[in-house]
Amino acid sequence: MEEENAVEILQRYRRDRRKLLDFMLAGSLIKKVIMPPGAVTLDDVDLDQVSVDYVINCAKKGGMLELAEAIRDYHDHIGLPYMNSVGTADEFFLATIPESSGSPPKRAPPPIPVLISSSSPMVTNPEWCESPSAPPLMRSESFDSPKAQELTVDDIDDFEDDDDLDEVGNFRISRRTANDAADLVPRLPSFATGITDDDLRETAFEILLACAGASGGLIVPSKEKKKEKSRSRLIKKLGRKSESVSQSQSSSGLVSLLEMMRGQMEISEAMDIRTRQGLLNALAGKVGKRMDSLLVPLELLCCVSRTEFSDKKAYLRWQKRQLNMLAEGLINNPVVGFGESGRKATDLKSLLLRIEESESLPSSAGEVQRAECLKSLREVAISLAERPARGDLTGEVCHWADGYHLNVRLYEKLLLCVFDILNDGKLTEEVEEILELLKSTWRVLGITETIHYTCYAWVLFRQYVITSERGLLRHAIQQLKKIPLKEQRGPQERLHLKTLKCRVDNEEISFLESFLSPIRSWADKQLGDYHLHFAEGSLVMEDTVTVAMITWRLLLEESDRAMHSNSSDREQIESYVLSSIKNTFTRMSLAIDRSDRNNEHHLALLAEETKKLMKKDSTIFMPILSQRHPQAIAFSASLIHKLYGNKLKPFLDGAEHLTEDAVSVFPAADSLEQYLLELMTSVCGEDTSGPYFKKLIPYEVESLSGTLVLRWINSQLGRILSWVERAYKQEHWDPISPQQRYGSSIVEVFRIVEETVDQFFALKVPMRSIELSALFRGIDNAFQVYTNHVMEKLASKDDLVPPVPVLTRYKKETAIKVFVKKELFDSKHLDERRSINIDVPATAMLCVQLNTLHYAVSQLSKLEDSMWLRWIAKKPREKIVIRKSMVEKSKSFNQKESFEGSRKDINAALDRICEFTGTKIIFCDLREPFIENLYKPNVSQSRLEGLIEALDTELGQLCSVIMEPLRDRIVTSLLQASLDGLLRVLLDGGASRVFHPSESKLLEEDVEVLKEFFISGGDGLPRGVVENQVARVRLVVKLHGYETRELIDDLRSRSSLEMQQGGKGKLGADTQTLVRVLCHRNDSEASQFLKKQYKIPRSHG
């Protein structure tokens, strides 16, 4: 709010000031007003720079008012602070700025220091700082040093301008290390006269003064002003501040602006004064003539004497520059063609040479020749310079500096004033005022808006390259955006720009191409290796891309090929990506080849570094480039894929085994490819039929790696099988320990299998599901082989069962061996012991085998789960494939692999060994008490209860060795064998066993005893299982309880077909069972029936 009030007060002050001046100048208070040089009316004078006090004093005196002196008086007093004239001694000037000095010290001021001779030591009293009675300091006394050591204005005046400028230049260099901008030069031909940048700079300043003089701002500074300016520059260099300097810098007046620009352009004050005085002298007597319409070099040659130079060498150098400028502006680079004026151009060249030759003549003759030549030169030069161009009126503009390309080179030097002399990376605070002032030179230099924006953008951009200040780059972009396209330009400007052409290296180049093509080339060079030049991907890269795109469009439109070009921003971005990726990849590859790789293959390191490169590219650079090319990431990824693929292919072609190099390179290459594909799909989607995917040649690392892994698996599986053979041959079927009641061979087999599995998953190479499936099948086969070895020497349980006795009917005589009906009984009878030599293992050995196989099947399940978990961890996600055929190949492994084959074989082996063990115990170990002597001579004298103790002994031996999970399984087999033995006794007990219906009750009791033995009060087998098994014996026991007549009637009621098919009768038994029951009856009715019906022979009497 206070700032707004201050602005309003300032505006009101300026309005009131102008009204006061208008009143005094328009009225009769001033007798005569003398205009400053270059001004015709008061409208040409900036009243804000006229001293009101000077005008009031002239009005009081009643004298003439010289506005030039009023302007000088205004600038001479502007640096002094305001004070009212009350005459009090308490008024003083502040030597510092209060706002920047901070708060006043809270301590008491120190006492007045005592000046002592240098030979005596200085004694200080520390109590002075705390003494309240210390006298206050006088305002004129200093804390720093005696007055004899201070610099006075006269001392400052002794500094030469050139020395000051050198010091300032050195200070600038010390603050900033300039970048090399040697490549960034406009594509313009050199000048025929050999004029230098210094010549252009000095002439540009002369033009600026002439144009400023047209607005009445040209005055010659006084001696006092010179001293004040020198003092201000020294204070700046010393880093000190003063109120007067601050106010001078904030001045927006034309005079101070020109003074500031003089320093910016490194023009000495002596030259400035010479030029100002010369221009003022040239304009004297030319009533109504504007200073900017003068032919400046000619007028200065005429009005500036050699006596104004410190030495003749400086004068000759100055004169040579003026003559060269006339030659360049009127002959070499004229804005208007000569036509019929060609002779005048020749005369002009001759006169210029004669003026230069006059300096070598004696003084009198030289002066005469120079004066004559200057007179003739004026006639010829003025006639050439005032030829009309672009429809202007004769005399309106003096065409001597607006010829291309001289004009743009001069304007470029003027534009350099916008940079701060002490910080060339910043624009000066007066940049807007400078640009506004430079517009006054447009008429003289023939500058249009398009030329201005182009040159200004060039100057800003080149300064950015030198200083690396991003702010300058942003300003340059703003100016580039202001350059109008062809259709946005007016017809006159379009026609004018079309004529601005020059030849460089036998190539015709337009104005825009001269300035924009170097910018474009520089931007292309930077972006063509953006990984190197924009290491951190700063915002500068985004601005550089903007510069490249703007200049590319402008140059494309300027070129004749613009109408036929189909190039776009996308193609430009792709060219940058292509170049930068190639350069970076090449550097990276060379660096890896030259580095110490610690025995790691260079392709593996290259893949890792390439992945890092792509991560940096996608996160830092691509967000910038994607603004103009949405699929730039896909292009970059496809390019990197190709570059690395070219390096990888020879290695893949030569890979035949899983060597250390292969194990190092394969995963790195596959990981890189998958990362690149993920980046591409993130931009292009899941559809892999896009243009960038089509160009990809897949590495197929996984396929090659899988093939090599399969070879390794096959070799390992052969090793496992040989180890299985070896382990089995060394197996003695002794328990390892009471806790580990299985054979040592299975432990060895699992050890080698697990080692192989560990090695498989330790292979850090890409794999497919096919390789895992092959490993599963190989291990499955190994355990099937092991199981077959266990079972190969185990006999059939039927070999343990003794031959079934011949069926005979009851009679007290020797049984005769006969054949029964063919349709009922087999013709082959075994009445002798089988001759097969059977190796019957011990029960403990069979139990160890059972435990071993159970351990195998249980560990297989754990191994299976472990392998799948490790596989899932190894392959956490579905891979992206480039070709659909690869997807189809992978579909062959859909279901989850397992050890189903070996598991099935082991379970079958467990069942067989259990059955064998039960049969062995009943029919071998308990054969005599069970099979041969049970129920002999009758049921009551040999009951089953007598066998329970022997069964319990066998059962205890089983349970002491067998593992807990197998207990019920083996006991169930023993129950089945016991029931088989009991049926054998009841149905095939031989001629010595007879059963009466009255004994069925005893038999039922025996069956119940056997059942309860295996149930064991709940500690044995489940009751339901035992009941189901005992059911078949109960039926036979029940048949033994029927009367003979009932059995015979049931047999007679059946047809022959039913008998052949084994159908059951009303008693629930088949024919064979009923016949066998009748064979064990000791009554004549059964014997007669069996003799008549089945021809069964009689037994021994």
UniProtKB/Swiss-Prot annotation:
GO cellular component: cytoplasm; plasma membrane; plasmodesma
Tissue specificity field: Expressed in roots, cotyledons, leaves, stems and flowers. Expressed in guard cells and mesophyll cells of leaves.
Residue ranges annotated for the MHD2 domain, each copy included: 941-1051
Keyword annotations: Cell membrane, Cytoplasm, Membrane
UniProt topology in membrane: Peripheral membrane protein
Subcellular location as annotated: Cytoplasm; Cell membrane
Highest taxon, organism lineage: Eukaryota
GO BP terms in the entry: protein localization to plasma membrane; stomatal movement
Null mutant phenotype: Retarded growth due to impaired stomatal movement.
Domain (MHD1): residue spans on this chain: 663-804
Keyword Cell membrane appears in the UniProt entry: yes
Biological role: Controls the tethering of the proton ATPase AHA1 to the plasma membrane. Is essential for stomatal opening in response to low concentration of carbon dioxide and light.
Family: Belongs to the unc-13 family.
The protein's name in its UniProt record: Protein unc-13 homolog
Organism: Arabidopsis thaliana (Mouse-ear cress)
